[in-house]
Amino acid sequence: PVVPLAMSDHPASVTFRTIGGEGDRPVSYSYGYANTGFVSAGERVYDSAYFKRIPAYLKKMAGGTDSISKLVEADKTLYVQGEVKDKPFTFNGIPMPTPFDKEQPAAQQFTPHAKKNYLVETVIADTWVMNVYEVSATGERKTIGVPKKDAGAN
């Protein structure tokens, strides 16, 4: 479940999640504004169904989490990106490029509004896709992110 953080009048709440990939493909999320560059959102984010199944001592050793929530500034374009950790194909211990190498999910941008909740979710499947949703109080999702433009201005 998306757990919104308590908000004052100004910030918006963003939750980062991963679906699929089991334990092999956690996603490292980062976010930032046009003039600040990206900062890490925190630990690697694993698929929540997978994360619930692994024993606590392994979680402590390996680190990671099944979701991260952050408060972000409202009415400023926010950029989000996720980097999927992939296991390279090796031949006799030598990493080899393969035609199956996946593209990292495209970075997204959106403008959060005060007191709203947003979900940044990467789905690990045949392709890796990251989407941004605005989540209503009733849990309905509306897709709002667009691929990040090179220009920082809207």
Task: Label the predicted regions.
Residues 1-154:
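Short loop/turn and low-complexity linker motifs enriched in small/turn-promoting residues
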